[in-house]
C-alpha cells in the first residue's frame, strides 16, 4: 500500500495508458491505407529484430535471475515441488538449444519474407517484360505495316509516273496524227480545186481516210493511257493516304508506350498515398473549380474579342454612313443653290425681255416692266430682310391649282406605264415625277407658242389667282412694308427719273430699228412677251425638277441618317452584352468561391471533430 501511495497516480495507472506505443496506435486511425501498411511492416521488423537480439543475449550470457521476457514483463512460472530442482539449476545446454531454435526460426521466417518479396519482384519483372515485349511486338508490327505501305505507295507512284509519261507520248502521237490528217485534207482540197483526175483524187481521198483512221486510233490509245494513268494516280494517292495513316498509328503507339513505360510508370514507382474521402472530394472540387474558372475566363475573352470586333465593324460602318450622309446633304445644298441661281438668272433675263418689249409697246409695257423690276427688287429685299419670298407665295396658288394637278396626272400615267413594263415601283415613281414635270413644261411652252384658247383660259385663271394673292399681299403688313421699301428705294435710287430716261431711250431705239407703225411694235412686243412666257415657264419647270432632285437627295440623306442611328443602337447593344458577360463571369466565380468555402468549412469541422474524439479517447 505504501508503495502505491508513494508512487502517486503513475502507480495506479493502467499499463496500456503508459505503454510507449500508445500514441502510435492512436494515430493508426488517422493514417492512409498505405501509411498504415508501412507502420505495421516497420513494427513487424522491429519485433523480429528485438526477438533476435534477446535470443542472442540469452544464448551468449548467463540468464538473469528474474528470467526477463521479451516484452519487459515479469515471467510467470508454474509452482514446483520442494524436492524438484530449481529452474535455475538446469543445464545451459537446454537454454542454448532453445535460443538456437528461436534464432533458427527467426532466420527461416526472414528467409520466407525475403523469398516472398523476391517472388513478388520477379512476378512484377515478368509482367513488365511481357508488357514491354507486347509493346515492342506491336511497334514492330506497325513499323512493318508502315514500311510495306510506304513501299507500295512508292511503287504505285512510279507506275503512275510511267503511265503519265506513256499518256503524254500517246497525246503527242495523236497530235501528229491530227497534223497528218490536216495535211492530207489540204492536199485533197488543193487537188479538187486544181481539177486533177479522178484516180488522183481517189488516191488522195484514200490517204485522207487512212490518216483519219490512224488519228482515231491514236486518240483512242491516248485516252486509254490517260485513263490508266489517272487510275494509277488515284491508287497511288490512296496508298499514300494509307501510309500516312500507318505513320500516325506508329506515332500514337510510340507516344502511348512512352507514357506507359516511361519514368512515370505505375509498376516501377510506389503508389502515391491515397487521400481520405473528404480530402479527395475537396481535391476533385478544387480541380473542377480550376477548370470552370479557366473555361469562364476563356469564354469571357472570346466574347470580349467578338464584341470588340463587332463594335469596330459597326463603328467603321457608322463612319462610312456618316460620310455618305454628309456628302448627300452637301450635294442637296449645292443642287438647291444651283437651282436658285438658275432661277434668279432666268428671272433677270425675263425682266430684261420685258424691258426690251417696252421699246415697242410704249408706256404701258414700260410700266409693266417697271412693275416687274420693282417686284423683282422688292422680292430680293424682302428675302434679304425677312427671309420670305412673296413671289413664291404668289406663284403657290398657280402651282397648286393648275400645274401641280397636271404634273400629278402625267406622272401617274407615266408611272403606271413603267410599272406595266416591269420597272420597280420606287424607280417608276421617281422617273414619272421627273418626266411629268418636263412634259408639263414642254406642253405649256408649246401651247404658249401656238396661242390656243385653252392656254388663254389658263392664263386668265393664273392672272385672277395672282391678282387675288397680290391684293391680299398688298393689304397685309408685308405688302405695306414692301410698298414703303419700294418708295424709299425709288426716291433714293431715282427710279422715276430712270423710268423717264428709259422711256426716251426706248423711243429712240424704236425709231433707230425702223419700227414706226404701231402694228409692228405690237408684233415685236407679242413675240417678246411669248419669249418671256416661255422662259418663265421653263424657269418654273427647272425649279420644279431641281426641287425633285433635291428632295431625292434629301431622302437618301435621311436613309443614311437612319442607318447611322441604327448602327449607334447596335454599338450600344454590344456594350450592354459585354457588360452582361462580365457580370455573369463574376457571378460564376462568386458561386464557385462560396462552394469551395463551404467545403473547406465542412472539412475543417470534420477535422476538429476527429481531434476532439481522439483527445477524449486518450484520456480514457
UniProtKB/Swiss-Prot annotation:
* Region feature Disordered, mapped onto this chain: 58-95
Where does the protein principally reside?
A: secreted
- Stored Gene3D superfamilies: Nucleotidyltransferases domain 2
Subcellular location(s): the record lists:
Secreted; Host membrane
Basic and acidic residues composition bias: residue spans: 66-84
Q: Which domain of life is it from?
A: Bacteria
Q: What else is known?
A: Human meliodoisis patients have detectable antibody response to BipB. However, BipB does not act as a protective antigen.
Q: Which family does it belong to?
A: Belongs to the SctE/SipB/YopB family.
The name under which this protein is listed is: Translocator protein BipB
Amino acid at each position: 500500500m505504501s508503495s502505491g501511495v508513494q508512487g502517486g497516480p503513475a502507480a495506479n495507472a493502467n499499463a496500456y495508458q503508459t505503454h510507449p506505443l500508445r500514441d502510435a496506435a492512436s494515430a493508426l486511425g488517422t493514417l492512409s491505407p498505405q501509411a498504415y501498411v508501412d507502420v505495421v511492416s516497420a513494427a513487424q521488423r522491429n519485433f523480429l529484430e528485438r526477438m533476435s537480439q534477446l535470443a542472442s543475449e540469452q544464448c551468449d550470457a548467463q540468464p538473469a535471475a528474474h528470467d526477463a521476457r521479451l516484452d519487459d514483463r515479469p515471467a510467470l512460472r508454474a509452482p514446483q515441488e520442494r524436492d524438484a530442482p530449481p529452474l535455475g539449476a538446469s543445464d545451459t545446454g537446454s537454454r542454448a538449444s532453445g535460443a538456437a531454435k528461436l534464432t533458427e526460426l527467426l532466420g527461416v521466417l526472414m528467409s520466407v519474407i525475403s523469398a516472398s518479396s523476391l517472388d513478388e519482384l520477379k512476378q512484377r519483372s515478368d509482367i513488365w517484360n511481357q508488357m514491354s515485349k507486347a509493346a515492342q511486338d506491336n511497334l514492330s508490327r506497325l513499323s512493318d505495316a508502315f514500311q510495306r505501305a510506304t513501299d507500295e505507295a512508292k511503287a504505285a507512284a512510279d507506275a503512275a509516273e510511267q503511265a503519265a509519261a506513256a499518256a503524254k507520248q500517246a497525246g503527242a502521237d495523236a497530235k501528229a496524227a491530227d497534223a497528218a490528217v490536216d495535211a492530207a485534207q489540204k492536199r485533197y482540197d488543193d487537188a479538187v480545186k486544181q481539177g486533177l483526175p479522178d484516180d488522183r483524187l481517189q488516191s488522195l481521198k484514200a490517204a485522207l481516210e487512212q490518216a483519219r483512221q490512224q488519228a482515231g486510233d491514236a486518240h483512242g490509245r491516248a485516252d486509254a493511257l490517260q485513263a490508266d494513268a489517272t487510275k494509277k494516280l488515284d491508287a497511288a494517292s490512296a496508298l499514300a493516304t494509307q501510309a500516312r495513316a500507318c505513320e500516325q498509328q506508329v506515332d500514337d503507339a510510340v507516344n502511348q508506350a512512352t507514357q506507359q513505360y516511361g519514368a512515370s510508370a505505375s509498376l516501377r514507382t510506389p503508389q502515391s498515398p491515397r487521400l481520405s474521402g473528404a480530402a479527395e472530394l475537396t481535391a476533385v472540387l478544387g480541380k473542377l473549380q480550376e477548370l470552370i474558372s479557366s473555361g469562364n475566363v476563356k469564354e469571357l475573352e472570346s466574347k470580349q474579342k467578338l464584341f470588340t470586333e463587332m463594335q469596330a465593324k459597326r463603328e467603321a460602318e457608322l463612319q462610312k454612313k456618316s460620310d455618305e450622309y454628309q456628302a448627300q446633304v452637301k450635294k442637296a445644298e449645292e443642287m438647291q443653290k444651283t437651282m436658285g441661281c438658275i432661277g434668279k438668272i432666268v428671272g433677270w433675263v425675263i425682266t430684261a425681255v420685258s424691258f426690251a418689249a417696252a421699246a415697242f409697246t410704249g408706256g404701258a409695257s414700260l410700266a409693266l416692266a417697271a412693275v416687274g423690276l420693282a417686284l423683282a427688287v422688292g422680292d430680293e429685299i424682302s428675302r434679304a430682310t425677312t427671309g420670305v419670298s412673296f413671289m413664291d407665295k404668289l406663284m403657290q396658288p398657280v402651282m397648286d391649282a393648275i400645274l401641280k394637278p397636271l404634273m400629278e396626272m402625267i406622272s401617274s400615267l407615266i408611272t403606271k406605264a413603267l410599272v406595266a413594263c416591269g420597272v420597280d415601283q420606287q424607280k417608276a415613281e421617281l422617273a414619272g415625277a421627273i418626266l411629268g414635270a418636263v412634259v408639263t413644261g414642254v406642253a405649256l411652252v408649246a401651247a404658249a407658242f401656238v396661242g390656243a384658247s385653252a392656254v388663254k383660259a389658263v392664263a386668265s385663271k393664273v392672272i385672277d389667282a395672282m391678282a387675288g394673292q397680290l391684293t391680299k399681299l398688298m393689304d397685309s403688313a408685308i405688302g405695306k412694308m414692301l410698298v414703303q421699301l419700294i418708295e424709299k428705294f425709288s426716291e433714293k435710287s431715282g427710279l422715276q427719273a430712270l423710268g423717264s430716261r428709259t422711256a426716251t431711250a426706248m423711243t429712240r431705239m424704236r425709231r433707230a430699228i425702223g419700227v414706226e407703225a404701231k402694228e409692228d411694235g405690237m408684233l415685236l412686243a407679242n413675240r417678246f412677251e411669248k419669249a418671256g412666257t416661255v422662259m418663265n415657264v421653263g424657269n418654273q419647270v427647272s425649279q420644279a425638277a431641281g426641287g425633285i432632285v433635291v428632295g431625292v437627295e434629301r431622302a437618301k440623306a435621311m436613309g443614311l441618317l437612319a442607318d447611322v442611328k441604327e448602327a449607334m443602337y447596335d454599338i450600344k447593344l454590344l456594350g450592354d452584352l459585354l457588360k452582361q458577360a462580365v457580370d455573369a463571369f463574376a457571378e460564376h466565380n462568386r458561386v464557385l468561391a462560396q462552394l469551395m468555402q463551404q467545403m473547406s468549412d465542412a472539412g475543417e469541422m470534420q477535422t476538429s471533430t476527429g481531434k476532439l474524439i481522439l483527445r477524449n479517447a486518450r484520456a480514457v
